[in-house]
Amino acid sequence: MDPMTNNIVTLPGSKVELFLEKGFDIWLHSYFVTGLVQLAREGTISLALMRRHDQVRCLAIQQEDYPLLLLKCTAPHHARPRLVCFDPRDQSDVWQKKALDECDLYFKRSTHPPDTAKLTPSQQSKVRPINPMFATWSPHAGGWTARMYWAFVRSALLQITKGQPLREAFNTCLRSCHNFASLSSVELYEDTPHGEKRPQVLFQTRLWDPSEEKGSWVDQCNRERVEMVRVLRTRLGNRCVGGLIRTPYAEKHYPDLLSNLTPTSKAKRPEFIRLCRQFLIRVNIKALFDAIPYSLGETLAANNCLVSETIRNSFATPLIADKHYLVFSTPNECADRCLELLDSPAKAQRLREEAHTYYRAAVCPKEAMRTYLTQALA
Protein backbone atom coordinates (compact mmCIF):
# COMPACT_ATOMS: atom_id res chain seq x y z
CA MET A 1 0.00 0.00 0.00
CA ASP A 2 1.07 3.57 -0.69
CA PRO A 3 0.55 5.27 2.71
CA MET A 4 -0.21 8.57 0.95
CA THR A 5 -3.27 7.18 -0.87
CA ASN A 6 -6.75 6.80 0.56
CA ASN A 7 -6.60 3.00 0.40
CA ILE A 8 -6.95 1.77 3.98
CA VAL A 9 -5.33 -1.59 4.56
CA THR A 10 -6.98 -3.71 7.24
CA LEU A 11 -5.38 -6.67 8.94
CA PRO A 12 -8.41 -8.86 9.70
CA GLY A 13 -7.74 -11.64 12.15
CA SER A 14 -4.17 -10.53 12.86
CA LYS A 15 -2.82 -10.78 16.38
CA VAL A 16 0.00 -8.78 17.94
CA GLU A 17 1.68 -9.79 21.19
CA LEU A 18 3.82 -7.32 23.15
CA PHE A 19 7.04 -8.10 25.00
CA LEU A 20 7.21 -5.70 27.96
CA GLU A 21 10.07 -7.21 29.89
CA LYS A 22 13.80 -6.48 29.58
CA GLY A 23 14.60 -3.44 27.41
CA PHE A 24 11.12 -1.92 27.40
CA ASP A 25 11.19 1.88 27.78
CA ILE A 26 7.80 3.58 27.99
CA TRP A 27 9.06 7.01 26.89
CA LEU A 28 10.83 5.63 23.80
CA HIS A 29 8.22 2.99 22.96
CA SER A 30 4.98 4.79 23.86
CA TYR A 31 4.35 5.93 20.27
CA PHE A 32 4.38 2.37 18.93
CA VAL A 33 2.24 0.96 21.72
CA THR A 34 -0.24 3.83 21.34
CA GLY A 35 -0.70 2.98 17.66
CA LEU A 36 -1.22 -0.69 18.49
CA VAL A 37 -3.78 0.14 21.18
CA GLN A 38 -5.65 2.36 18.72
CA LEU A 39 -5.68 -0.36 16.05
CA ALA A 40 -6.98 -2.86 18.60
CA ARG A 41 -9.66 -0.43 19.73
CA GLU A 42 -11.00 -0.09 16.17
CA GLY A 43 -10.99 -3.89 15.78
CA THR A 44 -8.24 -4.07 13.16
CA ILE A 45 -6.00 -6.31 15.28
CA SER A 46 -6.16 -8.17 18.55
CA LEU A 47 -3.52 -7.10 21.06
CA ALA A 48 -2.18 -9.09 24.00
CA LEU A 49 0.85 -9.48 26.21
CA MET A 50 3.32 -12.07 24.99
CA ARG A 51 2.94 -15.55 26.45
CA ARG A 52 5.59 -16.92 28.74
CA HIS A 53 7.02 -19.51 26.32
CA ASP A 54 7.51 -16.80 23.66
CA GLN A 55 9.11 -14.48 26.21
CA VAL A 56 11.95 -16.96 26.67
CA ARG A 57 13.06 -16.39 23.08
CA CYS A 58 12.75 -12.62 23.42
CA LEU A 59 14.74 -12.63 26.65
CA ALA A 60 17.54 -14.37 24.74
CA ILE A 61 17.41 -11.70 22.02
CA GLN A 62 17.00 -8.57 24.12
CA GLN A 63 19.83 -6.69 25.80
CA GLU A 64 19.37 -4.96 29.15
CA ASP A 65 20.79 -1.65 27.97
CA TYR A 66 19.24 -1.55 24.47
CA PRO A 67 15.71 -0.06 24.25
CA LEU A 68 14.22 -2.46 21.72
CA LEU A 69 10.48 -3.13 21.41
CA LEU A 70 9.71 -6.71 20.34
CA LEU A 71 6.40 -7.87 18.84
CA LYS A 72 5.12 -11.26 17.79
CA CYS A 73 2.76 -10.76 14.83
CA THR A 74 0.45 -13.49 13.57
CA ALA A 75 -1.79 -13.32 10.50
CA PRO A 76 -4.34 -15.92 9.34
CA HIS A 77 -2.61 -16.29 5.97
CA HIS A 78 0.82 -17.00 7.49
CA ALA A 79 1.78 -20.43 8.77
CA ARG A 80 4.54 -18.92 10.90
CA PRO A 81 4.32 -15.89 13.22
CA ARG A 82 6.63 -12.97 12.50
CA LEU A 83 8.97 -11.56 15.13
CA VAL A 84 9.33 -7.81 14.61
CA CYS A 85 11.37 -5.22 16.49
CA PHE A 86 11.37 -1.41 16.73
CA ASP A 87 14.64 0.39 17.43
CA PRO A 88 14.17 4.04 18.54
CA ARG A 89 17.84 4.86 19.15
CA ASP A 90 19.40 8.04 17.74
CA GLN A 91 22.44 6.41 16.15
CA SER A 92 22.07 5.15 12.58
CA ASP A 93 25.24 3.04 12.83
CA VAL A 94 24.35 1.20 16.05
CA TRP A 95 22.32 -2.00 15.89
CA GLN A 96 21.12 -4.75 18.18
CA LYS A 97 22.83 -7.47 16.17
CA LYS A 98 21.10 -10.41 17.87
CA ALA A 99 17.73 -8.91 16.92
CA LEU A 100 18.93 -8.29 13.37
CA ASP A 101 19.72 -11.98 13.04
CA GLU A 102 16.67 -13.36 14.86
CA CYS A 103 13.83 -10.99 13.85
CA ASP A 104 11.95 -11.09 10.55
CA LEU A 105 11.86 -7.29 10.25
CA TYR A 106 13.89 -4.59 12.04
CA PHE A 107 12.22 -1.16 12.08
CA LYS A 108 14.74 1.58 12.90
CA ARG A 109 14.07 5.22 13.76
CA SER A 110 17.45 6.50 12.51
CA THR A 111 18.06 4.88 9.14
CA HIS A 112 20.89 6.22 6.97
CA PRO A 113 21.52 4.16 3.79
CA PRO A 114 25.36 4.30 3.96
CA ASP A 115 25.22 2.86 7.48
CA THR A 116 22.67 0.22 6.56
CA ALA A 117 24.88 -0.79 3.61
CA LYS A 118 27.57 -1.92 6.08
CA LEU A 119 25.34 -4.79 7.25
CA THR A 120 25.30 -8.22 5.64
CA PRO A 121 22.86 -8.65 2.71
CA SER A 122 20.61 -10.79 4.91
CA GLN A 123 20.51 -8.14 7.64
CA GLN A 124 19.95 -5.31 5.16
CA SER A 125 16.89 -7.05 3.77
CA LYS A 126 15.21 -6.86 7.18
CA VAL A 127 15.74 -3.14 7.86
CA ARG A 128 12.80 -0.77 7.47
CA PRO A 129 12.78 2.99 8.22
CA ILE A 130 10.36 4.63 10.63
CA ASN A 131 8.45 7.86 9.98
CA PRO A 132 8.73 10.87 12.34
CA MET A 133 7.43 9.99 15.81
CA PHE A 134 6.87 11.47 19.27
CA ALA A 135 6.18 10.33 22.82
CA THR A 136 2.45 10.03 23.49
CA TRP A 137 -0.37 7.88 24.88
CA SER A 138 -4.01 7.31 24.06
CA PRO A 139 -6.70 8.55 26.47
CA HIS A 140 -8.85 5.66 25.24
CA ALA A 141 -6.36 2.92 26.12
CA GLY A 142 -8.68 1.35 28.69
CA GLY A 143 -7.11 -1.60 30.46
CA TRP A 144 -3.80 -1.11 28.70
CA THR A 145 -2.98 1.79 30.99
CA ALA A 146 -3.18 -0.52 34.00
CA ARG A 147 -1.18 -3.17 32.14
CA MET A 148 1.63 -0.69 31.59
CA TYR A 149 1.87 0.11 35.29
CA TRP A 150 1.80 -3.58 36.15
CA ALA A 151 4.59 -4.20 33.62
CA PHE A 152 6.80 -1.68 35.45
CA VAL A 153 6.12 -3.34 38.81
CA ARG A 154 6.67 -6.84 37.43
CA SER A 155 9.95 -5.78 35.83
CA ALA A 156 11.17 -4.39 39.16
CA LEU A 157 10.22 -7.59 40.98
CA LEU A 158 12.06 -9.63 38.36
CA GLN A 159 15.20 -7.54 38.79
CA ILE A 160 15.04 -7.97 42.57
CA THR A 161 14.91 -11.76 42.18
CA LYS A 162 18.04 -11.47 40.02
CA GLY A 163 19.88 -9.69 42.81
CA GLN A 164 19.37 -6.02 41.98
CA PRO A 165 19.31 -3.85 45.15
CA LEU A 166 15.77 -3.11 46.30
CA ARG A 167 16.21 0.67 46.23
CA GLU A 168 17.63 0.62 42.70
CA ALA A 169 14.77 -1.53 41.39
CA PHE A 170 12.21 0.66 43.18
CA ASN A 171 13.70 3.86 41.73
CA THR A 172 13.65 2.39 38.21
CA CYS A 173 10.00 1.42 38.63
CA LEU A 174 9.13 4.84 40.03
CA ARG A 175 10.89 6.57 37.13
CA SER A 176 8.98 4.48 34.58
CA CYS A 177 5.68 5.24 36.30
CA HIS A 178 6.49 8.96 36.35
CA ASN A 179 7.46 8.98 32.66
CA PHE A 180 4.27 7.12 31.76
CA ALA A 181 2.08 9.47 33.79
CA SER A 182 3.71 12.49 32.11
CA LEU A 183 2.85 11.33 28.58
CA SER A 184 0.36 13.59 26.83
CA SER A 185 -2.51 12.34 24.69
CA VAL A 186 -2.30 12.30 20.90
CA GLU A 187 -5.20 14.74 20.71
CA LEU A 188 -3.33 17.33 22.77
CA TYR A 189 -0.60 17.53 20.12
CA GLU A 190 -2.91 17.73 17.12
CA ASP A 191 -4.26 20.66 15.13
CA THR A 192 -5.63 21.10 11.61
CA PRO A 193 -5.11 23.66 8.81
CA HIS A 194 -8.29 25.37 10.06
CA GLY A 195 -6.70 26.17 13.42
CA GLU A 196 -5.62 29.77 13.94
CA LYS A 197 -1.90 30.42 14.45
CA ARG A 198 0.10 33.34 15.78
CA PRO A 199 2.29 34.82 12.97
CA GLN A 200 5.48 34.00 14.82
CA VAL A 201 8.37 31.53 14.65
CA LEU A 202 9.07 29.12 17.51
CA PHE A 203 12.60 27.86 18.06
CA GLN A 204 13.77 26.26 21.29
CA THR A 205 16.99 24.35 21.73
CA ARG A 206 19.20 22.92 24.47
CA LEU A 207 22.92 23.42 25.08
CA TRP A 208 25.16 20.67 26.42
CA ASP A 209 27.37 21.31 29.44
CA PRO A 210 30.99 20.52 28.43
CA SER A 211 31.74 19.54 32.03
CA GLU A 212 29.14 16.78 31.85
CA GLU A 213 29.35 15.67 28.21
CA LYS A 214 32.58 14.61 26.54
CA GLY A 215 33.55 14.71 22.89
CA SER A 216 34.43 17.21 20.18
CA TRP A 217 30.78 17.35 19.16
CA VAL A 218 29.80 19.29 22.31
CA ASP A 219 31.43 22.61 21.43
CA GLN A 220 30.42 22.41 17.77
CA CYS A 221 26.81 21.57 18.62
CA ASN A 222 26.59 24.41 21.14
CA ARG A 223 28.14 26.94 18.73
CA GLU A 224 25.67 26.03 15.99
CA ARG A 225 22.68 26.31 18.30
CA VAL A 226 23.79 29.63 19.78
CA GLU A 227 24.31 31.06 16.29
CA MET A 228 20.85 29.90 15.22
CA VAL A 229 19.18 31.69 18.13
CA ARG A 230 21.17 34.87 17.52
CA VAL A 231 20.47 34.99 13.79
CA LEU A 232 16.75 34.31 14.15
CA ARG A 233 16.35 36.94 16.86
CA THR A 234 18.32 39.48 14.82
CA ARG A 235 16.51 38.81 11.54
CA LEU A 236 12.99 38.24 12.86
CA GLY A 237 12.89 40.45 15.95
CA ASN A 238 9.80 39.89 18.10
CA ARG A 239 8.44 37.49 15.51
CA CYS A 240 10.93 34.94 16.87
CA VAL A 241 9.85 33.25 20.10
CA GLY A 242 11.89 30.86 22.24
CA GLY A 243 15.65 30.61 22.59
CA LEU A 244 17.94 28.49 24.75
CA ILE A 245 16.22 26.21 27.22
CA ARG A 246 17.08 27.32 30.75
CA THR A 247 19.85 25.22 32.24
CA PRO A 248 22.62 26.25 34.66
CA TYR A 249 25.12 26.22 31.78
CA ALA A 250 22.96 28.35 29.46
CA GLU A 251 22.07 30.78 32.24
CA LYS A 252 25.74 31.31 33.09
CA HIS A 253 27.15 31.69 29.58
CA TYR A 254 24.27 33.00 27.44
CA PRO A 255 21.80 34.87 29.67
CA ASP A 256 20.77 37.12 26.76
CA LEU A 257 19.65 34.14 24.65
CA LEU A 258 17.49 32.31 27.21
CA SER A 259 14.05 31.19 26.14
CA ASN A 260 11.10 33.39 26.97
CA LEU A 261 8.77 30.38 27.01
CA THR A 262 7.70 28.18 29.91
CA PRO A 263 10.26 25.59 31.08
CA THR A 264 9.92 22.31 29.21
CA SER A 265 10.26 19.78 32.00
CA LYS A 266 8.13 16.68 31.54
CA ALA A 267 5.98 17.76 34.47
CA LYS A 268 4.87 20.77 32.41
CA ARG A 269 4.61 19.01 29.06
CA PRO A 270 0.86 19.57 28.54
CA GLU A 271 1.29 23.31 29.03
CA PHE A 272 4.25 23.41 26.64
CA ILE A 273 2.49 21.32 23.99
CA ARG A 274 -0.54 23.62 24.00
CA LEU A 275 1.78 26.61 23.70
CA CYS A 276 3.68 25.14 20.75
CA ARG A 277 0.46 24.55 18.82
CA GLN A 278 -0.20 28.30 18.69
CA PHE A 279 2.67 29.32 16.41
CA LEU A 280 2.53 29.45 12.62
CA ILE A 281 6.10 28.24 12.17
CA ARG A 282 8.36 25.92 14.11
CA VAL A 283 12.06 25.50 13.36
CA ASN A 284 13.58 22.04 13.73
CA ILE A 285 17.27 21.20 13.80
CA LYS A 286 18.89 17.78 13.76
CA ALA A 287 19.34 15.94 17.02
CA LEU A 288 22.57 14.28 18.09
CA PHE A 289 24.02 11.80 15.60
CA ASP A 290 21.92 13.48 12.85
CA ALA A 291 18.83 11.83 14.33
CA ILE A 292 15.31 13.08 13.68
CA PRO A 293 14.15 14.84 16.86
CA TYR A 294 10.80 14.00 18.42
CA SER A 295 9.95 17.69 17.99
CA LEU A 296 9.66 17.12 14.23
CA GLY A 297 6.85 14.63 14.76
CA GLU A 298 5.26 17.01 17.27
CA THR A 299 5.45 19.84 14.71
CA LEU A 300 3.64 17.77 12.09
CA ALA A 301 0.97 16.82 14.62
CA ALA A 302 0.49 20.46 15.66
CA ASN A 303 0.27 21.54 12.01
CA ASN A 304 2.83 24.29 12.44
CA CYS A 305 4.69 25.11 9.23
CA LEU A 306 7.82 23.01 9.47
CA VAL A 307 11.12 24.72 8.63
CA SER A 308 13.82 22.11 9.04
CA GLU A 309 17.54 21.69 8.77
CA THR A 310 18.48 19.31 5.97
CA ILE A 311 17.15 15.84 6.83
CA ARG A 312 19.71 13.10 6.29
CA ASN A 313 17.84 10.00 7.39
CA SER A 314 15.23 7.97 5.52
CA PHE A 315 11.51 7.63 6.28
CA ALA A 316 9.04 4.87 5.47
CA THR A 317 6.92 7.51 3.73
CA PRO A 318 9.03 10.25 2.08
CA LEU A 319 8.76 13.70 3.65
CA ILE A 320 9.17 16.00 0.65
CA ALA A 321 10.96 19.36 0.83
CA ASP A 322 8.95 22.34 -0.53
CA LYS A 323 5.79 20.25 -0.29
CA HIS A 324 5.55 19.14 3.33
CA TYR A 325 8.22 21.43 4.78
CA LEU A 326 10.85 24.04 3.87
CA VAL A 327 14.52 23.17 4.22
CA PHE A 328 17.61 25.17 5.21
CA SER A 329 21.31 24.52 5.75
CA THR A 330 22.46 27.75 7.47
CA PRO A 331 20.90 30.07 10.08
CA ASN A 332 20.44 32.83 7.50
CA GLU A 333 18.71 30.41 5.13
CA CYS A 334 16.45 29.44 8.01
CA ALA A 335 15.51 33.08 8.58
CA ASP A 336 14.85 33.47 4.83
CA ARG A 337 12.49 30.46 4.80
CA CYS A 338 10.64 31.76 7.85
CA LEU A 339 10.21 35.19 6.29
CA GLU A 340 8.84 33.58 3.10
CA LEU A 341 6.06 32.02 5.13
CA LEU A 342 5.41 35.03 7.35
CA ASP A 343 5.12 37.26 4.29
CA SER A 344 2.93 34.85 2.30
CA PRO A 345 -0.08 33.53 4.23
CA ALA A 346 -1.23 31.62 1.13
CA LYS A 347 2.07 29.73 0.90
CA ALA A 348 1.98 28.98 4.61
CA GLN A 349 -1.57 27.65 4.30
CA ARG A 350 -0.66 25.35 1.39
CA LEU A 351 2.29 24.00 3.35
CA ARG A 352 0.07 23.33 6.36
CA GLU A 353 -2.49 21.49 4.23
CA GLU A 354 0.11 19.23 2.61
CA ALA A 355 1.81 18.58 5.94
CA HIS A 356 -1.53 17.70 7.54
CA THR A 357 -2.22 15.16 4.81
CA TYR A 358 1.19 13.63 5.46
CA TYR A 359 0.61 13.55 9.22
CA ARG A 360 -2.78 11.85 8.96
CA ALA A 361 -1.42 9.19 6.60
CA ALA A 362 2.08 8.57 7.90
CA VAL A 363 2.76 10.00 11.37
CA CYS A 364 -0.31 9.70 13.59
CA PRO A 365 0.41 6.56 15.65
CA LYS A 366 -2.48 4.44 14.41
CA GLU A 367 -1.75 4.92 10.72
CA ALA A 368 2.01 4.58 11.18
CA MET A 369 1.57 1.25 12.96
CA ARG A 370 -0.93 0.14 10.32
CA THR A 371 1.79 0.74 7.72
CA TYR A 372 4.47 -1.12 9.70
CA LEU A 373 2.24 -4.11 10.47
CA THR A 374 1.19 -4.31 6.84
CA GLN A 375 4.87 -4.54 5.89
CA ALA A 376 5.53 -7.10 8.62
CA LEU A 377 2.65 -9.34 7.57
CA ALA A 378 2.88 -8.88 3.79
Segments predicted by a language model, with ranges:
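Catalytic binding pocket for nucleotide-activated donors in carbohydrate/polymer assembly enzymes
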Residues: L257-L261, E271-A378
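Nucleotide-sugar donor-binding catalytic core of glycosyltransferases
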Residues: D2-N7, G13-T74, H78-P293, V307, ...
